[in-house]
């Protein structure tokens, strides 16, 4: 199983909009994960957010669905800079 992490900085004046849209995104992506996706904020900078996706069986299908969902829910409107996506797998 694989895990994916998306991180970015939000416009603090749009935090409420960002939370609503990202929560919709996480709900849409839950079917691709064995664990519920989560939205986190950095401890020392609450404008830096991270989405965690754990237990991804098919990373290619997940990535395509995530890109579609990001566009569907307009999840770049409130981001300052770029949205970064990283993938990890457990060591064997």
Q: What is each PLM-predicted segment?
A:
Residues 1-66, 85-92:
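Short S/T/G/P-rich N-terminal loop/turn motif that feeds into the first structured element of a domain
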Residues 27-30, 71-75:
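A general structural signal for alpha-helical elements within enzymatic catalytic domains
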